[in-house]
């Protein structure tokens, strides 16, 4: 993630010259026989990659990799803004002036991060970035573009031999990106940031309604990035279904619901945030209040039903960016979305409100012969529906041949550490990970909620 220029105090940049050849050799040898390895990345968002010295370093790394394995391709994941970091002031001035002239900006924006939120396309096509990319892409087989979708078509025309992949892209832009992947032969795919959520870059994907609650400036207790298609406990988030629909892998629509507690409020979000929606029809205290239902759907039309009453049809699929919004009123019961293609039903999905008297449920995943044991916990009613709007504090009592390695939820703002043995459910779910103390170890785990509910499982 860095070469000679450090990104933070005491990072790998201090040791790069001494270690890069050894580390490249270890990387290639470790995975040489794995057929799933198709690319070797020589660096991600390297600040100096567009300089003469950086271009030489890139060349040296690529040649080292090829000497060890000439069957795979090399890739550099390039952030054009990072590569032209010393030109940021000029880029801001030029882009701002151009937008003011077009009447798209009032002329008061002088902060680069603010400009990036709304005008990344204009920034990444700046000549200063174009100049740096020529050096950055000179030695690699594939040019990885981080957040530079606006360059796909223009660079294909200017550099007909340049093969491009979206090496990091914003989750909300997958519909736009995928249309370009299908259209342009020189753009071979798309990697989102990110697949699985992680600890760090706290708040980058957290939707907020007050400054400091989300985004890069999120304060305590925010710990997770919250930008993953899959949350940190392994459950799919709405963005993963959005992507599945865009890829043409899902014919049924997918229903999510924006939080009605914030209806009409201004959502503060980074480019990694789609919305604050959750796939649930449980919103305690919001009965009779307006709500936005967000549907990801293929086909050309999608229809929404609330408790059996049609809310009308709206365009869906590629013409709507695969994302359709309906305004309605929340009432417990059920919502159903039906996708159509040329008037014929393609698929449907229903969300039902879970009963408030849900029980604590726990299930051990099959991990025989493995050191780690994963136990899913949820608040479920008798029909197996997860109660998402009444989260509870949980404790875990472990007996037998294991100890708790981590106990938590997908909440980006957990109030307990993962090793405390205490957590709160998030949207009705949590996860406990055990580490066995001996091979073939077994025992029991009892989960207790602060309201008296409990569940016991064997491992």
Set out the residue ranges of the language-model regions.
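Substrate-binding cleft of carbohydrate-active enzyme catalytic domains
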Residues: 1-69, 75-78
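Substrate-binding clefts and catalytic carboxylate motifs of secreted carbohydrate-active enzymes
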Residues: 36-40, 62-67, 74-370, 382-386
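Extended low-complexity, serine/threonine- and proline-enriched intrinsically disordered segments
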Residues: 300-309, 391-406
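Short aromatic-acidic-glycine turn motif
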Residues: 314-316, 357-361, 397-413
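Short, hydrophobic beta-strand segments
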Residues: 324-330, 419-438
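Conserved structural position at the C-terminal beta-strand
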Residues: 339, 379, 447-449
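Short, exposed coil/turn segments at beta-strand boundaries within extracellular/luminal domains
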Residues: 342-347, 449-456
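Short, solvent-exposed loop/turn segments enriched in Ser/Thr/Gly
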Residues: 369-375, 441
């Amino acid at each position: 993630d860095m070469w000679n220029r450090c990104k933070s105090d005491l990072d790998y940049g201090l040791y790069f010259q001494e270690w890069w050849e050894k580390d490249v050799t270890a990387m290639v040898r470790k995975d040489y026989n794995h057929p799933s390895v198709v690319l070797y990345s020589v660096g991600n968002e390297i600040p100096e990659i567009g300089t003469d010295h950086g271009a030489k370093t890139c060349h040296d790394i690529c040649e080292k990799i090829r000497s060890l394995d000439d069957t795979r391709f090399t890739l550099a994941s390039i952030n054009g803004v990072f590569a032209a970091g010393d030109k940021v002031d000029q880029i801001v001035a030029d882009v701002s002036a151009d937008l003011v002239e077009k009447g798209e900006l009032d002329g008061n924006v002088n902060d680069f991060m603010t400009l990036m939120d709304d005008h990344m396309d204009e920034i990444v096509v700046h000549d200063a970035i174009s100049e740096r990319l020529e050096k950055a892409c000179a030695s690699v087989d594939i040019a990885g573009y981080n957040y530079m979708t606006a360059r796909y078509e223009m660079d294909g025309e200017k550099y007909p031999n340049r093969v491009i992949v979206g090496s990091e892209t914003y989750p909300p832009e997958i519909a736009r990106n995928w249309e370009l992947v299908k259209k342009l032969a020189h753009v071979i795919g798309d990697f989102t940031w990110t697949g699985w959520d992680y600890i760090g870059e706290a708040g980058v994907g957290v939707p907020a309604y007050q400054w400091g609650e989300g985004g890069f400036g999120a304060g305590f207790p925010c710990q997770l990035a919250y930008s993953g298609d899959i949350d940190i406990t392994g459950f799919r988030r709405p963005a993963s279904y959005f992507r599945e629909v865009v890829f043409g892998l899902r014919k049924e629509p997918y229903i999510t619901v924006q939080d009605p507690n914030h209806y009409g409020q201004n959502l503060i979000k980074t480019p990694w945030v789609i919305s604050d929606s959750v796939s649930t029809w449980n919103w305690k205290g919001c009965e009779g209040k307006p709500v936005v239902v967000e549907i990801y759907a293929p086909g050309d039309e999608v229809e929404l039903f609330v408790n059996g009453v049609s809310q009308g049809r709206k365009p869906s699929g590629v013409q709507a960016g695969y994302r359709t919004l309906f305004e309605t009123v929340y009432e417990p019961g059920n919502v159903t979305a039906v996708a159509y293609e040329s008037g014929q039903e393609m698929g449907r999905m229903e969300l039902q409100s879970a009963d408030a008297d849900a029980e604590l449920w726990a299930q051990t995943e099959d991990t025989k012969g493995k050191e780690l044991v994963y136990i899913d916990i949820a608040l479920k009613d008798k029909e197996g529906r997860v109660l998402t709007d009444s989260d509870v504090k949980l404790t875990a009592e472990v007996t037998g041949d294991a100890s708790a390695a981590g106990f938590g939820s997908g909440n980006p703002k957990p109030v307990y550490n993962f090793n405390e043995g205490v957590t709160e459910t998030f949207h009705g779910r949590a996860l406990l990970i055990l580490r066995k103390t001996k091979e073939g170890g077994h025992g029991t785990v009892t989960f207790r909620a602060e309201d008296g509910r409990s569940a016991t499982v064997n491992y």
